[in-house]
Amino acid sequence: MRQRRLGKNGPEVSALGYGAMSFTDFYGPASDAGSFALLDLMAENGVTHLDTSNVYGSGRSEALIGSYLATRPSARDKFVIATKAGISKDSDGKRKLDNSAAHLEAELDASLKRLGVDCVDLFYVHRREEARPIEQVVETLATLKAKGKTRAIGFSEIAPSSLRRAAAVDHIDAVQSEYSLWTRSPELGLVQACAELGTALVAFSPVGRSMLTDTPLRPEGLDRIPFLKVNPRFLPGNHEANLKVIARFRALAADMGEPTAAVSIAWLLAQGEHVLPIPGTRSLDHMREAIRGAEITLSTEDLQRIDAVLPIGWAHGDRYDAVQWVGPERYC
C-alpha cells in the first residue's frame, strides 16, 4: 500500500483510508461480524487510515472499532484513528451545531472511552458553528492536543477562507470534504489551499455514493436510504440522467481492464499527494476494488480520457438539499 502523510506534520498513513459510517445502518443493515471482517481485510492490506465520528450510529461506529481493538490489541498500532464532534441536539431533539470548548472536550472524552484509547490520532470539528469565531475553536482544539487527547486537529466541510483563518492560529492537519469525479467543488480553492498550507485533504464519498462504481444505486433502491431519497442528485430525472452519464465512465473503466471504483480512487489520488480518499462500504469485494485503486497509477492520457467522459460539472442536481446543507460551508 502506498503511503502518504496526514498533513505536513502528521504521521504516514495509507494512501487509501476507510470511512466508518458504513459500520452503522446509514446505508443499509450493518453487522458487527461484517465490520470486523472489513477491519481484518484493511489490516491485511495495509489500509491504516480509519475515519469515524461520535454521531455515526450515535457512537456505534466508535464502539465497534473499540471492540475490535479490544479483541485484537496488536491492531491498535496498525491504525491511525480519526474521529469528530460538533454536531449535537437541542432540548427538543433538533439537530444543532456546538463548537464550544465544553462540548468538544466532553464528546472527545466519550469517544476515547468508546474507542478504548487514551488519545486519537486526529480530531475534527465535524461541522463549523457559524456564530463562533473559528479562531476560538482552533484554540480549543490546540488545548485538547496539549492535553494529549489528540495528536492532530482538523475541520470537516469548511471553506478555503475559513481554513486560512484557522491556520493563522495553529497548523490544521486535515480538512475533510466530499471530493470525487462527481463533486469537484474543492478544486475551487480548497485543494489549492490545503496544498499550500500543508494540510491533508481527506476526501469522503470518493466513489459518489456508489454512482462511480460498477453497481450504482438504482431508483428502486432508494427507499432503504432516506438520506439519498431526498438528495437532489437522486431525485427523479436527475438520477436517471446521472446514470446515463456514468455508463460512459463504466465503459471506459472496463476498457482499461479495471473496476470502475478503482479508477475513481486512482483519479482522486492523482489530484495531489495531499489528497487522501476514505471510501465507506459494507462489502469486502467493494473494499478490494478500492484497494486496487490505490495500486493504479493513471497516465496523462488516462486522465484526459476520464475528463472527456466526465467533464467537470457534469452531475445533475446539487450534492445536498436545503436541510443537508446546514453546516457545510459553501464557497466560490
Positions of PLM-derived features:
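Terminal-tail/helix-coil boundary detector
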Residues: M1, E196, D223-A251, D255, ...
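N-terminal binding-site loop/beta-alpha segment at the start of enzyme catalytic domains
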Residues: M1-F79
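Conserved, mostly hydrophobic/aromatic
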Residues: L6, Y18, S35, L50, ...
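N-terminal small/glycine-rich loop or linker at the start of catalytic domains
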Residues: K8-Y27, A82-K96, C119, Y124
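Active-site beta-loop-alpha junctions enriched in small/polar residues
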Residues: M21-F23, S53-V55, K84-S88, V125-R128, ...
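Glycine/proline-rich, positively charged
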Residues: Y27, E44, D90-S185, G189, ...
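Generic structural signal for well-ordered alpha-helices
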Residues: L39, E62, G66, L108-L112, ...
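Aromatic-lined glycan-binding groove of carbohydrate-active enzymes
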Residues: P186-R224, P259
